[in-house]
Swiss-Prot record:
Binding site for (6S)-5,6,7,8-tetrahydrofolate: S111, L112, L113, P114
Catalytic activity line of the entry: L-methionyl-tRNA(fMet) + (6R)-10-formyltetrahydrofolate = N-formyl-L-methionyl-tRNA(fMet) + (6S)-5,6,7,8-tetrahydrofolate + H(+)
Gene responsible for this protein: fmt
Reported function: Attaches a formyl group to the free amino group of methionyl-tRNA(fMet). The formyl group appears to play a dual role in the initiator identity of N-formylmethionyl-tRNA by promoting its recognition by IF2 and preventing the misappropriation of this tRNA by the elongation apparatus.
Coiled coil, from the record: none
Annotated Pfam families: Formyl_trans_C, Formyl_trans_N
Lineage, highest ranks first: Bacteria, Bacillati, Cyanobacteriota, Cyanophyceae, Acaryochloridales
Species in which this protein is naturally found: Thermosynechococcus vestitus (strain NIES-2133 / IAM M-273 / BP-1)
Keyword Transferase belongs to the record: yes
Protein name per Swiss-Prot or TrEMBL: Methionyl-tRNA formyltransferase
Record GO terms (molecular function): methionyl-tRNA formyltransferase activity
Matches recorded under PANTHER family: METHIONYL-TRNA FORMYLTRANSFERASE, METHIONYL-TRNA FORMYLTRANSFERASE, MITOCHONDRIAL
The enzyme's E.C. designation: 2.1.2.9
Amino acid sequence: MNIVYFGTPEFALAPLQRLLQTETYQVLGVVTQPDRRRGRGNQLSPSPVKAFALRHGLPIWQPPRLRQDPQLPEVLRSLAADVFVVVAYGQILPQSILDIPRYGCINIHGSLLPRYRGAAPIQWALYHGEEETGVTTMLMDAGLDTGPMLLKRKVRIHLEDNATTLSAKLSETGADLLLDTLQQLPQLQAEPQNDAEATYAPLIQKSDYAIDWGRSALALHNQVRAFYPYAYTQWQGTALKILQTWPLIPEVAAKLPEPLQSYVREPEAAAPPGTVLALIKGWGPVVQTGKGPLLLSQVQLSGRKAQSGWDFVNGVRLAIATQFAIVPSAL
């Protein structure tokens, strides 16, 4: 089976790698987003998928605007691919491209559709505290993640998962599911989505990263792991990224690391939100939220390396009753 692969970020690597490892499938080329300026040097850098394709000698196309490229549809048509596989490509495929391959365009989506349609399903599943998500393969249509579904596979979300770890799990699961889908493709019966059950996962905005200590400990924990590594608060006028937290509340006590379970308390308004309540040796500061205490176990001051919450306590001589600024979020 001949395949053209559309993909851009790290999430799209495992399925592409799995295709190349399987003799049944021939990857004819890769379509990915144009190089972007990244890092402190602001240098042009290829997408993870492009870098992978270069290492493996695959033809690469990088149209800035897929809908405005008059030549690419003809190039793709000339390849006579059986199927296009699309994984977090980053642009909507026009009907003129969807109609090209014999078996259509198969998308790997990082949720159990029709839940979390859109650009950021992994992040919003974490944000909403889901304990289960998964991967869906579907036949693409002109809508946003609205095509008929082929196969699904569930993945458990753990309390310590963040956007990076969950993305890696779903990418590997998606790679397995893609091979199963392609193997069964001629016989698979696509299942229409129930639009009444659809939920949405829109693009993330920078304003979503701000920590509002008036929210509950569990809600803030979910925000930190959903938007890892960008959630932040303010400490003495400086941005402080919050990279890892543990809500010290009864409803998740059994899921906490064992050394922390003895610190679990019933939520009470012991101090104004954002106030440091305690310092747990070897772990970090415990902060009052709108409902329950939240342990900050990994943080990063602006311009510095990430560090444990305890190293932060010692480095800045953080004291009990210190107040973190409340930065009202847009959420």
